[in-house]
Amino acid sequence: MAPAPKLINWKRNLFVAWLGCFLTGAAFSLIMPFLPLYVETLGVTGHQALNMWSGLVFSITFLFSAIASPFWGGLADRRGRKLMLLRSALGMSIVMLLMGMAQNIWQFLALRAVLGLLGGFIPNANALIATQVPRNRSGWALGTLSTGGVSGALIGPLIGGLLADQYGLRPVFYITAGVLLTCFVLTLLYVKEQFTPVQKKDMLHARQVFAALKSPKLILSLFVTTMIIQIATGSIAPILTLYVRDLAGDIHNLAFVSGLIASVPGVAALMSAPRLGKLGDRIGPERILVFMLIVSVLLLIPMAFVQTPWQLGVLRFLLGAADGALLPAVQTLLIYNCTNQVAGRIFSYNQSFRDIGNVSGPLMGAAVSASYGFRAVFCVTALVVLFNAVYSWWCLQRRPTRMREDTLQEE
């Protein structure tokens, strides 16, 4: 018989998982500043072709991740989450190494697709911690864990740009592979999991997974919420620099100001996520989720009417503070309303919806701005988030009032 789960030092696992998410977030964002430049070195010429290929190599990773996530989630429920962390870190390390050796754009595109197939360190880390931490500490733990990937993604572009200037483009891929290999070694040595493998014949099928849930409709609504959160975040990304230029006029440090305004939401999320997660443990993650969605709407609307970049920067900082609570609240509600037996698949389905949002958001933002202008993007995004707030509130109201208390008592 497996040892009692209480023997797991979940706080140490949380620390190592946070470090792994930080390294993974940094590794992925290391290459982002010069991705179009690398595409150009692979033989792509012309403004239109460069834009098309840059968009393809960026989005194909998310598309293939959305396809592969449910498979890896099922394997996590059968073989354990630590194995999935190791598989993801090592697989991504090898692919990053090969990316640095790519000789043409087709090889690079194929490797970006494989990267999506083999990814998933952060969602698997979320599933591992969510199934180990005491339920009454879930909000704080998942909020804290979310800061790992965010902080890595914030520092990655800065370091990646410096490394590319110093050593060239290809060596950055080799350095990134080394970072991911470090993540693999740390996970192998220090993450502990007590998991009894499940035979394939004993596994629940996808339909049975949802039938076994306390509230399948609620879980589906949380998936949709995750997708809309990513759509709202991504819709602004394609037009942000151009919007800042419209607000600022001809300034010599446009790239710096745009980068600063792009990064302030992440800084705010770092500060707010653990605190709001802890508050959610006290008052309920459902209240945090709905309230912060409404706050996001109230911050998005005035962004359409700002007159200076600094006004936009302040509003985006406040928006980041609100957004920092959203995904941890969703993940906490997911673990409240599913069993450990199916947690891997539930989190993987959620990751698929997140990837769909990552692809759809920039497309929506680009389409709206092309037709109606930059300011309309913020209004349309606010409407989408408002729908999400109302939809989430409605679904959470239909949940049995004792559901959360019953889930807590199971621990």
Swiss-Prot record:
Gene3D superfamilies: MFS general substrate transporter like domains (1.20.1250.20). The chain crosses the membrane at residues 14-34, 56-76, 89-109, 113-133, 144-164, 171-191, 219-239, 254-274, 288-308, 376-396. InterPro entries: MFS, MFS_dom, MFS_MdtG_subfamily, MFS_sugar_transport-like, MFS_trans_sf, Mutidrug-R_MdtG, Tet-R_TetA/multi-R_MdtG-like. Its main location: membrane. SUPFAM superfamilies: MFS general substrate transporter (SSF103473). GO terms for cellular component: plasma membrane. One of its GO terms (molecular function) is transmembrane transporter activity. It is a multi-pass membrane protein. Pfam families: MFS_1, Sugar_tr. It is found in: Cell inner membrane. It comes from the Bacteria. Keywords: Cell inner membrane, Cell membrane, Membrane, Transmembrane, Transmembrane helix, Transport. PANTHER family: MULTIDRUG RESISTANCE PROTEIN MDTG (PTHR43414:SF6). Belongs to the major facilitator superfamily. DHA1 family. MdtG (TC 2.A.1.2.20) subfamily. This is Multidrug resistance protein MdtG. It comes from Serratia proteamaculans (strain 568). The gene is mdtG.
